[in-house]
């Protein structure tokens, strides 16, 4: 089986119900899934770019897991993308070059506080989740990655029941294991 790296960008995992449960479920498959917690690994947001490149070069699939913050990712993921996906390594002008992110399967696993119906043209947000995630999708395309369907959990609020969270964790694990 191919190895998948989950790049976790949650600034407060201790108080997360959904993301925490997802990670607990994925840890059962540590031989197939590498969980890379950016906040734990880099609390000061100063990345070891060579180490990050080595990790990425040794996996087939990458999943960016994060809570939606103001219709984007937490700042640490944006900084990671800026610092790690470098010109000449992840992308460039030479169509014949072997850029390291080319043809990697890349997906998004996102938790959202609001209900799914809010994310539509007629919903309170006025945009679909696909539209909200366009900057990430454009990045994947630009670096030559293969975009995977996004895994989205709506209504990620403290009142969300354990049964719904547990069910989503199993589905998330299956989603990754079947890449």
Q: What is each PLM-predicted segment?
A:
Residues 5-7, 36, 63, 107-109, ...:
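Hydrophobic/aromatic beta-strand patches that form the interior of the parallel beta-sheet core
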Residues 23-27, 133-179:
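Glycine-rich phosphate/pyrophosphate-binding loop and the adjoining helix
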Residues 1-32, 171-173:
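N-terminal beta1-alpha1 ligand-phosphate binding loop
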Residues 17-21, 47, 75-79, 163:
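Generic recognition of short, well-ordered alpha-helical segments
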Residues 32-45:
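A short beta-strand-loop structural module common to alpha/beta enzyme folds
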Residues 11-13, 40-43, 126, 155-159:
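Short histidine/acidic/glycine/proline-rich micro-motifs that form metal-
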Residues 43-59, 168-171:
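Glycine-rich, highly charged phosphate/nucleotide-binding loops
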Residues 50-137:
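Helix-loop-strand module that forms the ligand-binding subsite of alpha/beta enzymes
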């Amino acid at each position: 089986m191919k190895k998948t790296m989950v790049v976790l960008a949650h600034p407060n995992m201790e108080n997360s119900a959904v993301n925490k449960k997802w990670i607990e479920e994925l840890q059962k498959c540590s031989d197939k899934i590498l969980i890379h917690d950016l906040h734990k690994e880099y609390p000061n947001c100063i990345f070891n770019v060579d180490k990050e490149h080595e990790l990425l070069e040794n996996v087939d699939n990458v999943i960016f897991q994060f809570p939606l913050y103001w219709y984007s990712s937490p700042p640490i993921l944006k900084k990671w993308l800026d610092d790690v996906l470098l010109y000449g390594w992840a992308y460039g002008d030479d169509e014949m070059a072997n850029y390291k992110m080319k043809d990697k399967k890349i997906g998004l696993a996102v938790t959202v506080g609001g209900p799914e119906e809010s994310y539509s043209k007629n919903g309170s947000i006025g945009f679909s989740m696909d539209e909200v995630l366009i900057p990430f999708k454009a990045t994947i395309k630009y670096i030559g990655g293969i975009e995977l369907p996004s895994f989205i959990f709506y209504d990620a609020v403290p009142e969300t029941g354990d049964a719904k969270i547990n069910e989503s964790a199993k589905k998330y694990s299956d989603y990754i294991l079947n890449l």
